[in-house]
Amino acid sequence: MSASSTAAAVPADGSGLIVTEAAETGHHQAFWLWVLCLTGVDYFSTLAYQPSIAITSAGRLAPLATVLLVLVTLFGAVPIYCRVAKSSPHGQGSIAMLQRLVHGWTGKFLVLTLLGFAATDFVITITLSAADAAKHLIENPHFEKAPEWLHSQIGITLTMILTLGALFLKGVREVIGVAVALVVVFLLLNLVVIAGGLMTLLREPQLISAWWERLVAGDLGIAGAHGEPLPAAPAIVPLTFGSAAMMTMLLFPKLALGLSGFETGVAVMPQIKGDATDTEQNPAGRIRRTQYLLLTSALIMSVMLIGSSIVVTTLIPIEALAKGGPAFERALAYLAHAEGGRTLLPFFGDTFGTIYDISTILILCFAGSSALSGLLNLIPRYLPRFGMAPEWVKATRPLVCVIIAACVIVTLLFKASVEDQSAAYATGVMVLILSACAAVFIERYRERSGSRWRRIPWATGFIGLVFLFTAGDIMIAKSEGLIISLFFIAAIMGVSLVSRAFRSDELRTVRFRFVNNESRFRWNTLQHLEVPVLAPHRPGGRTLDEKERELRAWHHLEDDIPVVFVEVSLGDTSEFLQEPVLNIVHEGGRYIIKVSRCASIAPTLASLAISLNGASRPIELHFGWSDESPFKMNLGFVLFGEGNVPFLVKELLQDAIPDTARRPRVIIG
């Protein structure tokens, strides 16, 4: 918002500044199970590739690693995000919690860093989902009849991403009804495939025995899962319980994709219908139903992950799951098509498999649209409020173009490979979960009383250490995700700081608040008196009597001209929009406006002048000279809200009120 637009918002009677930002539009609210499907298009769609990634990462240990993943999900992620839902019930998630807990520029840079990881999460969701959708399309038997030039993994992936961007440029948005249909059909088809596999294992228990015997013998099959040639006579090292447990814990982070979806789960909170008794300050019904959503989605996903892992590990040869194999990145689709000569249920085959592929492709594309929508909501939510967004961020279309361009670059960088992008995706997911753990840990610590050791929430700390280990392992094993995240962080910080510098000449004042009714009454009195002179005074130096004598002498003010003094104390200078608090006192025959909790001095003084500006004659602001260098003063203004105040006030007033006859006058002497 420019200074001129703020001035237009000032009432003609000079009664003060009004809110400069549009009020948030209400969200359409629905039953929590339907909203679960909206977040489920992101969370549940990972079933399309998670079982295959589990095998390539953990080999025959995949079922055990998946069980550990489920335990971490149910006893780690779910409790953490249930607390996030309670502490941030308006859909802003863990990032908003940390912003409240960490103040100043440290908090702003922390938010920008987390936005970089969130951008990684959402962008990779778009590219990875499109890549796996392309994989399912290419491997479908009916698609084999298509011309050879259409069988390009990169080409189809880019086409899907560009189509998604074009739809958003046209104004297409996802709706809950479509999400419900897609999720229900996709989950039912996956349930049929998994149930068919489990029934086969019940009929042929020797398949489980064979898997277990090879596992106990130490034949993990990890090399084969990566497409590497298996040794003709591998050295057998029997696997003990301890070594199996240790390897499972070490391999578990590679399955971290199964933890995606929780941040989205709290982001959709405004769309959940709560109780009739809910209030804005305490939406207890919405919080409770969001916690139902988080637990229900985690339970559904846990059952699906364990079932799919057991079925895929025991029924599909490792060689088929290896890179380049027919089941690579599409394990459940491989079973649905009855490939490999094994028909789990009589109706499995090309027809059922094609239905499964269509459902998978649709939900993966919808997951991409959900991620793009998430970014379009996330970036404008923070950056404009920080004064760190250029004007075009407010428009959807330019932001869509930037995000789609990033998706195209990432797709080309990873050659549209699902496996290669999985680590980058997991990096963004784990850092966001880790930020939620940190926010919950700090909040619980501050809530408790007693000694330092008694205040520490040990359970939350242990969960945080598990996620810290997971995130660290992913970043060390595959640093691509960290590199991409750092690129996004650098881009966001660069644009944000440049934008903050360019927007430093805006008024930035949302409204004035008052410490008590007396101050409000005196404010109204000053507006009706049409104050002729406003004089800033820095507390702690000269007394007001000395300041007034010097002011009248240097500025040739008669004794009968009243002077209102303004004392400004800064609050959080990292904030952009400000709501200064006014304490107006009457001492020694003069009015003193004591301003606190403001982010910047010059916009505060300019806003005061506009609000107190008389209808018959302009108000005058009288300043003294400063001996500081211009560069130091300008830098101090951008970073700390101080600096060359008289010049900046004059610039702000010129932009706000073009009419020189009505504009408050700035006098320096």
Task: Give short role names for the model-derived ranges.
Residues 1-49, 98-100, 104-112:
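Membrane-interface "cap" regions at the ends of multi-pass membrane proteins
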Residues 23-29, 34, 84, 88-120, ...:
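Transmembrane-helix boundary/entry motifs in multi-pass membrane transporters
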Residues 52-100, 106-111, 127-160, 185, ...:
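Extracellular loop-to-transmembrane helix junctions
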Residues 104-108, 148-159, 273-304, 380-415, ...:
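Loop-to-transmembrane helix boundary motifs in multi-pass membrane proteins
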Residues 187-231, 310-317, 436-451, 472-475, ...:
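Hydrophobic alpha-helical segments and their helix-loop junctions in multi-pass secondary transporters
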Residues 197-210, 277-283, 296-333:
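Extracellular/periplasmic helix-exit of transmembrane alpha-helices
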